Amino acid sequence: MPSSGPGDTSSSSLEREDDRKEGEEQEENRGKEERQEPSATARKVGRPGRKRKHPPVESSDTPKDPAVTTKSQPMAQDSGPSDLLPNGDLEKRSEPQPEEGSPAAGQKGGAPAEGEGTETPPEASRAVENGCCVTKEGRGASAGEGKEQKQTNIESMKMEGSRGRLRGGLGWESSLRQRPMPRLTFQAGDPYYISKRKRDEWLARWKREAEKKAKVIAVMNAVEENQASGESQKVEEASPPAVQQPTDPASPTVATTPEPVGGDAGDKNATKAADDEPEYEDGRGFGIGELVWGKLRGFSWWPGRIVSWWMTGRSRAAEGTRWVMWFGDGKFSVVCVEKLMPLSSFCSAFHQATYNKQPMYRKAIYEVLQVASSRAGKLFPACHDSDESDSGKAVEVQNKQMIEWALGGFQPSGPKGLEPPEEEKNPYKEVYTDMWVEPEAAAYAPPPPAKKPRKSTTEKPKVKEIIDERTRERLVYEVRQKCRNIEDICISCGSLNVTLEHPLFIGGMCQNCKNCFLECAYQYDDDGYQSYCTICCGGREVLMCGNNNCCRCFCVECVDLLVGPGAAQAAIKEDPWNCYMCGHKGTYGLLRRREDWPSRLQMFFANNHDQEFDPPKVYPPVPAEKRKPIRVLSLFDGIATGLLVLKDLGIQVDRYIASEVCEDSITVGMVRHQGKIMYVGDVRSVTQKHIQEWGPFDLVIGGSPCNDLSIVNPARKGLYEGTGRLFFEFYRLLHDARPKEGDDRPFFWLFENVVAMGVSDKRDISRFLESNPVMIDAKEVSAAHRARYFWGNLPGMNRPLASTVNDKLELQECLEHGRIAKFSKVRTITTRSNSIKQGKDQHFPVFMNEKEDILWCTEMERVFGFPVHYTDVSNMSRLARQRLLGRSWSVPVIRHLFAPLKEYFACV
């Protein structure tokens, strides 16, 4: 070991002078190289590798150090716990592997061989972060190693100076200021449709996984506490704290140890650190279970509840943000604390205009105040009405009382009474809102209980049972074991609250699934198939029938559950696959088709009496000698289908007043009926004075536009906005045209609209018209599917639909000579050009000259029952004529409805 005495002073001075000169020469060479190649960058010796957008280029005078590796390679084992690591990275301390062909390739641990002074010593492999070389502490260096140590310091200073000049040249990743990780926020709403049953199953599964993980962690903690060895204590003391990126909501918490540990132990430590870290401990309030107001762009302040990331099934929220479950729809969002307010700020956050306009907002307010009143112990007595149809008013009254209580400051307990109980602060606890009964759908279920002690009511425990357990799978298993009757369960969702039989298959159906079936049974996508499953009116993956004349779909979940495991995969492999409605067999596992399903389906829609009304007034037939010509008021007349049918039936028409705004429709009516129609323009401009002047009327007919009512339209505005409001114009003029009291002359009316409308809109229309609709599908009397609702007081509207000899029931009967139909019936023809295409493969319905072809306009007119060339006026294009037909009525259906009028009015 060389001495460090005074005798070596002169030699040391000479060596330092040589080192200084050598360093200056290298610095000049480096400056020349940088001026010649400004894009080349020097790589630091001993710096742990990290990913960059541009790979660094090593300079010629920089020795290759075996300790310099990529991010995935371990650091030198000599590095102590004080060495800096890239933020959020976990580097295992193990022996580095030298590169093949390097001078140190044969040395263990990368140590340089004797006599090789150009190699970087192990001390040079210390961690360098942000341009600073961090030296080790607690290690003594002998005087004999002074030269190597000084040389290393000089090299580090050179590299530091070079980095100072090139700051930012390597991109954001190499500069002092790091580019923040993008924050991924989850706004309200899911990227795809998720049924309520599927979401509940996911929540239950996440809960079970969370509880299982918590048990494993508890066992691991108990085992670690029993192992009180000194080595484990050293490991725990030497472990640096876990670091988490504050800008990344999904960055995991990692734990590091100074020495390599076994794989199992590493997994234990990582799992424990990730799961045991408390949530929302940033000192900014809003803990788990608290009721809050949250603000998202485009929405009013919306009530929600702070929940754990476990419940969302996604990643942890970043510091300063919270996971919020919104009341009303039960969806999740990450919201920063600056956009949150406590529920006690009800006066400033509650928005009365949104409450009056949006049913979902009313539902959310109801649910959050139910929870708040339960926590505060505030009792709001439920209103009990003898008529179940008035339960919507009871809900409104109760909601109004709760809002007044909230606006008054949640007295007497105040904001203190809104704090969550201890059991709701558990991050693994799932929260479910009380059942909401919409005012327009209140007759479907009784109003919810007002406070917790009333859990003995019949409705709430059943809802809890459906939510908390995979009831459908369990009940189907019991049916297979002959322990339960399938008619006693809802085969659509698994509910035990069966109110009627499923119209297509053996099994029951609950009220909620009935509402879904009424909305979705006749809702079709652009490919002509049903939008949702025939059984459950849901499903994300559906199997489409291969029969060209069938348009039904079945979801994979229902098929595997009711038919048998693996049945869906077998159906996918079968090509073409005939569904369970058009297959030859009637029984497929537990799925048994009803033999009388056509009549049951018709009665399902015809007897859909959610509201009971007085039967319409029945007029006795008028003696033949006293019959007079009919006077008609036609609103939204279209192409005068009503007048055409009356003429076909031979009924004399005295006056036909029509309200229409489409110029093409008016042209068709004027030309085809020789000016016998009196057009009066926009329906909104017709007043009561006009009705008295043009009347009296014997028949009022109309069908308002369905664009904003059909649930097929994702941008629909409903009954009270857009074109949906035109229904109230029909109601207004119908009221003005009714005979006055004491006038017993026969008076009839008819209103038509689409079947695929929301249940609430249908109920509102029925409430105003004081009549329940009948559903009639034109496929029974024509070559096209066209299901429509009809409200009215025409005699015999509920009678079976029967075709006549002149009705063209097959598409082939409607085609011109030389053209072959590929389908027996076509899907509903709308104003859109692609509605002509049929099937999942979007085939044209006609085959001509060995090619597929569309329907000609004359053929579409035959499909609707119009005379040939009925719309061929004023050089209208094919698409314009299709738009007129797509908005019109089916002539055979209107003939079926108008036929009884021959007993009341004069005929030719």
From Swiss-Prot:
Consequence of substituting residue 717 to A: Reduces activity about 3-fold
Q: Which residues form the active site?
A: 706
Which keywords, in A-to-Z order, does the entry hold? Chromatin regulator, Chromosome, Cytoplasm, DNA-binding, Isopeptide bond, Metal-binding, Methylation, Methyltransferase, Nucleus, Phosphoprotein, Repressor, S-adenosyl-L-methionine, Transcription, Transcription regulation, Transferase, Ubl conjugation, Zinc, Zinc-finger
Sorted alphabetically, which Pfam families does this protein's record hold?
ADD_DNMT3 (PF17980), DNA_methylase (PF00145), DNM3A_N (PF22855), DNMT3_ADD_GATA1-like (PF21255), PWWP (PF00855)
User: What compartments host this protein?
Assistant: Nucleus; Chromosome; Cytoplasm
Residue ranges constituting the SAM-dependent MTase C5-type domain according to the UniProt record: 630-908
Q: How does it associate, per the subunit comment?
A: Heterotetramer composed of 1 DNMT3A homodimer and 2 DNMT3L subunits (DNMT3L-DNMT3A-DNMT3A-DNMT3L). Interacts with DNMT1 and DNMT3B. Interacts with MPHOSPH8. Interacts with histone H3 that is not methylated at 'Lys-4' (H3K4). Binds the ZBTB18 transcriptional repressor. Interacts with SETDB1. Associates with HDAC1 through its ADD domain. Interacts with UHRF1. Interacts with the PRC2/EED-EZH2 complex. Interacts with UBC9, PIAS1 and PIAS2. Interacts with SPOCD1.
Look up and give the organism this protein is from: Mus musculus (Mouse)
The protein here is known as DNA (cytosine-5)-methyltransferase 3A
**Entry binding sites for S-adenosyl-L-methionine:** 637-641, 660, 682-684, 887-889
GO terms (molecular function) for this protein are:
chromatin binding; DNA (cytosine-5-)-methyltransferase activity; DNA (cytosine-5-)-methyltransferase activity, acting on CpN substrates; DNA binding; identical protein binding; lncRNA binding; protein-cysteine methyltransferase activity; RNA polymerase II cis-regulatory region sequence-specific DNA binding
**What is the purpose of this protein?**
Required for genome-wide de novo methylation and is essential for the establishment of DNA methylation patterns during development. DNA methylation is coordinated with methylation of histones. It modifies DNA in a non-processive manner and also methylates non-CpG sites. May preferentially methylate DNA linker between 2 nucleosomal cores and is inhibited by histone H1. Plays a role in paternal and maternal imprinting. Required for methylation of most imprinted loci in germ cells. Acts as a transcriptional corepressor for ZBTB18.
Q: What is known of its domains?
A: The PWWP domain is essential for targeting to pericentric heterochromatin. It specifically recognizes and binds trimethylated 'Lys-36' of histone H3 (H3K36me3).
Q: Where are the coiled-coil regions?
A: none
Biased segments, Polar residues type? 69-80, 242-256
